[in-house]
Amino acid sequence: MVSPRPVGLMLLLIIARVSRGAGIGFRFASYIDNYMVLQKEPSGAVIWGFGTAGATVTVTLCQGQETIMKKVTSVKGPSNTWMVVLDPMKPGGPFEVMAQQTLETTNLTLRVHDVLFGDVWLCSGQSNMQMTVLQIFNASKELSDTAAYQSVRIFSVSLTQAEEELADLDGVDLSWSKPTAGNLGHGNFTYMSAVCWLFGRYLYDTLQYPIGLVSSSWGGTPIEVWSSRRALKACGVPNTRDERVLQPEIKPMRNGCESKESSCPFRRFVPCDPVAGPATHSVLWNAMIHPLQNMTLKGVVWYQGENNANYNRDLYACMFPALIAGWRQTFHSGCQGQTERFFPFGFVQLSSYLLMNSSDYGFPEIRWHQTADFGSVPNPKMPNTFMAVAMDLCDRDSPFGSIHPRDKQTVAYRLHLGARAVAYGEKNLTFQGPLPKKIELLARNELLNLTYDQEIQVQRKDNKTFEISCCSDHQCKWLPAPVNTFSTQTLILDLSACLGTVDAVRYAWTTWPCEYKQCAVYHTSSVLPAPPFTARITHRGI
């Protein structure tokens, strides 16, 4: 015979399990939490989660004792999800969001507090986006400078991968938080992106309203892992989702120098054993981007490309615009049209990488392909985009390898200039360096005339930065073309080294184009470098 006490205890345990199960069944999506930032007007923010199929869900937005709005929906099967779109809100806060599920006589309530409305930016890419504030120049000062930016909120996605597209995140490294020295400087390549944080901080300085920053990055990853299968198929990328394509990560290695003093002329950095960053196609799109599709966004900033220097490099000019188009379509559809169809997409053009040999490791080509082979953005294949040139921000002494330069402040500053111009429509703002608008061969004088679209400052004249393609007997080779003279918007190259026909010209076509902020051509403010370019010569003077 069973005694009454154990039976009663078992019954209580069963009731407890049922109660907890019912509570767990009704929840917000993983990224809806205290301290979050929701997208402000003119878009409506999406609030969604999971519940019991057939139940009614009422979402209430409150400020203090005042009810701002209520939205009612139901839980849809078989996904067991519910979703509402809030009316567009002006920037500000704080607010409380309450969701109540009603099924027959049972009510369950969820609350999140200290919610702000502002602009939400998603930051993604590989290790240069993943680097934290702890790893950059002036880290101590940057980490102590958070008190004035409590309306810039941060969120970080866990490093997870999936074979199929997930509806919700499988893990969160850092829930929505106010910035602190602890969560910004948690460790190396963990928690919060330095570029993302600094970009948001610069935006806040300009806009003076809340900014939400979502970091979803993983070092040592090619673009294929961040792309949907549909996007890759559109570019003819072989489907290798069942294979692991090993990618080299970069680490520093001494080359006959016993110290880090400047007397050491150089160090070389060589690929080491592959790191944990996945290379199976689409697995990070599935696990770290697709689950965010219902989040209403202002835009995206991206820093990636190093791992494609020797992997599907020639397809990058197709894959990158396809990734942008795919993300835009998914986020627009996922939040019922609240995220703009062609939302602003900013990116960092690859920085420098110190090599011992003459090989360029594919960096010049990737920089070019990052612009869909146009040399600048926005362009017809990449509308509503902006780019931060970073090839002049080299860092030969970086403890993380020269491929990981520590000046992320300048990167973020240049990115925010692009955002102000492209995403926010600020007029009369110079946000990119000089671009050649006319290239003319002056045959009689053996000179090449480059006319730029803005005033230029030539910071150095050498015989390496500009090169010409010299053709003779059906063979062409690149030769140096020293700067002869220059004026406010014009630069003239000496072609005397070419005894044949000059067919093309290129600028800064190397992995390490210059020393820190010492490339040849800048805007007159000295803040924005001219991007690298290559061009055929079609105008020939007399």
Curated annotation (Swiss-Prot):
Glycans are attached at N107, N138, N188, N294, N357, N428, N449, N463. Its EC number is 3.1.1.53. It catalyses: N-acetyl-9-O-acetylneuraminate + H2O = N-acetylneuraminate + acetate + H(+); an Ac-O-9-sialoglycoconjugate + H2O = a sialoglycoconjugate + acetate + H(+). Keywords: Disulfide bond, Glycoprotein, Hydrolase, Lysosome, Serine esterase, Signal. GO terms for cellular component: lysosome. It comes from the Eukaryota. It is found in: Lysosome. Residues 1-23 form the signal peptide. Catalyzes the removal of O-acetyl ester groups from position 9 of the free diacetylated sialate N-acetyl-9-O-acetylneuraminate (Neu5,9Ac2) in the cytosol and of the diacetylated sialate residues of sialylglycoconjugates in the lysosomes. Together with the sialate-O-acetyltransferase they regulate the balance of acetylated sialoglycoconjugates, key players in various processes such as cell-cell interactions, host-pathogen recognition, and tumor antigenicity. This is Sialate O-acetylesterase.
